[in-house]
Design a protein with these regions (language model features):
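Generic recognition of flexible, low-complexity loop/linker segments
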Residues: 56-59, 121-127, 221-225, 236-241, ...
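Extended alpha-helical coiled-coil "stalk/arm" regions that scaffold and mediate dimerization/assembly
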Residues: 229, 233-240, 280
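In a subset of proteins, long, contiguous C-terminal domains/tails are tracked
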Residues: 718-767
Length: 767
């Protein structure tokens, strides 16, 4: 952490001299430190290598044990802008979409459940951050007898592509997709400046030019020129860097039901052997060190140390909410909402349909309905041709959902969206493709639908460990309000249960599954249930509007009748067992009543619990990787959840004690100011034009007007200690009435059950 090993970034149009003035106090008088260690290059292999490794499996049944296989190649050093960009394009060509040739071959082989690798789901970031580039492709959910066949399929498919050639339309689509991404420079919630810093680091940290990764126009033009003079440019890359490259690793992950117990036993053995060798003095030193660690964990930072951290003051914050311009065209044919914002010549289109048009029992299909629309082809073209057209003529079209509570109602706002973007000059193509997808879908391809369902099931199963806290939190809240209940049906643990059953139904009762999809489409895709939300420059609207109205007019008139759902809320405590060494512990409830004046302080309280009480008790002392408190202002739900947590009962006790912590809270002015600033920072979260347009639409649908937003901002800015102390009583409701959902190992769940007494937790297997 010596300054000699640091890199300093500034983003903005501020004077350079001012930047040096900011740095000077931190660097003056600091002596140079040791030189930064260099990351050495990997020694090249003379021949490919195969490695087999075990991983923990929950089931001992052979039919339930799924293998995974990956084939990876080490590529040249990441110091050639043209090669780096061309490698990203090649990865997208091979794996970037379900219609990409290598990904398609793996999917259609039927030998696995889900594809992974470089380029899948835009997974190109890590590749660019390493000193040497790489490419990998793999399949998971494989039967043991098919492992070698999967490796052969990957190598044979690449060989066939190098020899027979890659479809030129696929190449054009991928080149356009990568170019659109580079020119749009849209990274969602990540500020552009931060992304630019990260890009610069990809070369700078290895001693290269930090500006090199930022200049993409020259290598992009060079690649386009090469494709004209050398049409088989990518086939040549494929042959040179993959097929003829001996630096290849085949990694086979083999399920082992005993692996977890072997790990634990090995650890216990190592501890016993180490303890046996310790002298009494060494034991005493370990004891004293442990006690000192505990003291440090329990000792708050001194005011003097905290004062060293630079911070804003309340006067630095904007007092008024930031508003987003919205123009509404209501002509009796359905709403068209337009957000005039500068978008650099891009139109963002959100075409939405009200899910309340459907009976509740069909909602779980929305785990796969959007993908079925876009990835099964249409009456005019198969899904490969459809994917090529989307890639070549647009910046992408994706399915999305907006699920939210709304002010003044127990009903949710639940919408299905097609979200697309294109250069304004291609807006006609964007809406023509959308019309084709919405009016001419093909749901009758049984094998393709089965592949989509298998992939979604595998995606959810793979997310259990990295995103377990989100799944547990959502399942807790699904017992209390409609919006969370809908989310649980379409993208939660309940959705995983549905997808597992759906695979069997596709095999055994295909006509009924097909009928369900057709019924969903008939009821949902209707003019009366539609909402068009557009974002672009005001001057571009005359070129876009005719295409919007044309698509709206083409939608069927029948369907779209709104239904009221009656959710069957499950509020019992649940334990969900998975093969893991850590737990995810959730607890929460819907508060009986939250006074309107408390919404602002509730945001402060949840933020404060995250950075103080939960940080200290659950993370520092309890050993969890993370813990959070959340508050939903629409439903009044308050919930806690932990991440990668070795505890269960201890964590629940910390949650229950949060109310006393708030009651006794006495923050000094500086600490209270920091908490307020943190909440305002989230209220004023960074948004690019597409996100602004979607956020404005969401606010209008849910009743979160600018007036309501201003009231809550005023509450946040004026929060005092007594406001937070009064919330202790509300948090008592969570302690006394909260629902508990825990995901973790069978052993940990049973231990928690025994510690707290029988029958407080119903345990069932999840994985």
């Amino acid at each position: 952490y010596h300054p000699s090993n640091a890199r300093f970034f500034f983003y903005g149009d501020d004077p350079v001299a001012k930047r040096f003035d900011l740095l000077r106090p931190y660097l003056e008088g600091v002596k140079p430190g040791p030189a930064s260690p260099q990351v050495e290059l990997q020694a090249s292999f003379d021949a490919p290598v195969t490695i087999t490794r075990p991983y923990p499996a929950a089931s001992e049944k052979p039919e339930d044990q799924k293998h995974a296989l990956s084939v990876a190649w080490l590529l040249p050093v990441n110091d050639d802008p043209l090669l780096s960009l061309a490698t990203a394009m090649l990865a997208h060509i091979l794996m970037g979409t379900p219609a990409s040739p290598l990904r398609k071959a793996l999917i259609e082989s039927g030998m696995g459940e889900d594809v992974f690798g470089t380029g899948v789901d835009d997974d190109l970031g890590l590749m660019d951050m390493l000193r040497q580039l790489y490419f990998n492709a793999g399949l998971k959910g494989i039967k043991g007898e098919n492992v070698e066949a999967v490796e052969r399929l990957i190598l044979d498919t690449l060989k066939d592509l190098a020899e027979a050639g890659i479809d030129q339309e696929t190449v054009n689509a991928s080149v356009n997709t990568i170019e659109f991404q580079l020119r749009e420079n849209n990274f969602g919630r990540l500020p552009r400046g931060l992304v630019i810093f990260i890009r610069a680091l990809s070369t700078w940290k290895y001693g290269g030019d930090p500006l090199q990764p930022l200049h993409f126009t020259e290598p992009l033009s060079a690649i386009k020129d090469r494709l004209v003079s050398e049409p088989r440019f990518f086939e040549g890359m494929l042959a040179e860097h993959l097929l003829e490259n001996p630096h290849r690793v085949t990694l086979h992950m083999q399920p082992d039901p005993a692996f977890q117990s072997k790990l634990e036993e090995a650890e216990q053995t190592r501890l016993r052997e180490t303890a046996a060798k310790l002298s009494s003095e060494e034991r005493q030193r370990i004891f004293e060190n442990a006690r000192e660690v505990q003291r440090l964990q329990e000792t708050p930072d001194s005011p003097e140390d905290l004062a060293k951290l630079p911070m804003l003051e309340l006067d630095d914050l904007e007092k008024k909410v930031r508003t987003i311009p919205l123009e509404i065209a209501e002509d009796g044919e359905g709403p068209i909402w337009f957000h005039p914002l500068p978008t650099n010549g891009i139109v963002y289109a959100d075409i939405g349909f009200d899910l309340h048009s459907l009976p509740a029992q069909l909602l779980p299909y929305f785990a796969i309905y959007g993908r079925a629309l876009l990835e099964m082809g249409t009456a005019r073209r198969d899904y490969v041709e459809l994917s090529q057209r989307m890639g070549y003529q647009t910046g992408g079209i994706e399915p999305a959902a907006l699920i939210s509570g709304q002010l003044g109602s127990d009903e949710s706002q639940s919408w299905f969206f097609l979200r697309g973007k294109a250069m304004v000059g291609q807006s006609g193509a964007l809406f023509d493709i959308s019309r084709e997808v919405l009016l001419e879908p093909r749901f009758d391809q049984r094998d393709r639908l089965r592949q989509i369902v298998m992939e979604e099931k595998a995606r959810l199963e793979s997310s259990l460990l990295p995103s377990g806290h989100q799944l547990v939190s959502g399942r807790v809240q699904s017992g209390f309000d409609e919006a969370a209940w809908v989310e649980e049906q379409i993208d939660g643990i309940e959705s995983l249960f549905f997808l597992r059953k759906l695979i069997k139904r596709i095999d055994e009762d295909w006509p009924e599954v097909l009928q369900d999809l057709q019924t969903i489409h008939r009821l949902l895709i209707a003019r009366s249930a539609a909402l068009f939300n557009l974002t672009s420059a005001e001057s571009d609207w005359p070129r876009i509007e005719p295409h919007v109205r044309g698509l709206r007019q083409a939608l069927p008139e029948a369907g779209g009748e709104r239904r009221r759902w009656e959710p069957a809320f499950e509020r019992g405590n649940q334990g969900l067992s998975i093969p893991a060494q850590v737990n995810y512990v959730g607890k929460g409830t819907r508060l009986a009543s939250v006074p309107a004046s408390h919404h602002g302080p509730m945001n402060i309280a949840s933020s404060l619990l995250n950075t103080s009480w939960l940080w200290e008790r659950v993370r520092l002392q309890g050993g969890a990787y993370g813990a959070w408190c959340g508050y939903d202002p629409f439903s009044g739900f308050v919930g806690f959840v932990s991440y990668r947590d070795p505890q269960i009962v201890g964590t629940l006790k910390a949650y229950d004690a949060a109310s006393d912590y708030l009651r006794k809270l006495e923050l000094d002015r500086s600490e209270l100011t920091k908490s307020i600033i943190g909440v305002i920072g989230r209220l004023d979260a960074y948004m690019l034009p597409d996100a602004k347009g979607f956020a404005s639409m969401s606010r209008r649908l849910t009743g979160l007007t600018d007036e309501v937003r201003q009231q809550r901002r005023d509450q946040v800015l004026s929060t005092r200690n007594r406001d937070l102390q009064e919330l202790g009583e509300l948090f008592d409701e969570v302690a006394q009435q909260g629902r508990v959902v825990v995901m973790g190992s069978q052993t940990a769940l049973k231990d928690a059950l025994a510690e707290k007494g029988e029958n407080w937790l119903h345990i069932s297997p999840l994985l």
